[in-house]
Design a protein with these regions (language model features):
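Extended catalytic/binding region for NAD+/ADP-ribose chemistry, centered on the ART fold
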Residues: 18-43, 121-126
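Active-site and NAD+-binding cores of ADP-ribose-processing enzymes
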Residues: 1-12, 21, 49-149
Length: 149
């Protein structure tokens, strides 16, 4: 997260993303620091170099509340670049149904063979009592160290 937002880890953008349509907030997280950094770098490019960023570390107190999107259930062209409406429609339904506060999904940046070992985690910020299920362990300040092109 940028320096502006890291103090409120439950904040989210209402801009459209791969798994959410514009106007519906969703928090995107990763299974670890490397995939989280890769995702952000792929989305933003080097536009954010030279700024300080924060990685928010958290634990989910009830892992049984993490849903998993199985490979066989992935929407057609789920990893299309740029992302398509089909994954946004899937995410909209998931957000509105509120079956799970968390949903494990594959990264469009990695080969599917890495899933579910490496994955993204979608978090529904409107899930009832969401804050009861997440424990924040802190944050790590970092800078992207990119080679100049």
């Amino acid at each position: 997260m940028s320096e502006t937002y890291y103090k409120n880890p439950f904040s989210c953008s209402f801009s459209a993303g791969r798994w959410n349509p514009k106007g519906l907030g969703m928090i995107y997280a990763g299974s670890g620091p490397a995939i989280s950094l890769l995702e952000y770098l792929c989305i933003k490019g080097n536009a954010f170099s030279g700024k300080s960023w924060y990685m928010i570390e958290f634990e989910i107190s009830k892992p049984n509340l993490i849903g998993t999107l199985e490979k066989e259930s992935l929407p057609e062209q789920w990893n299309k670049l740029p992302h398509g409406k089909i994954t946004q429609d899937f995410g909209r339904i998931w957000l509105q149904e509120k079956e799970f506060p968390f949903l494990r999904v594959p990264s469009a940046r990695l080969n599917l063979s890495f899933y579910p070992m490496e994955h993204n985690l979608l978090i529904n910020p409107d899930f009832p009592d969401l804050k009861k299920y997440i424990e924040f362990d802190g944050q790590v300040r970092f800078d992207y160290l990119l080679n100049s092109i």
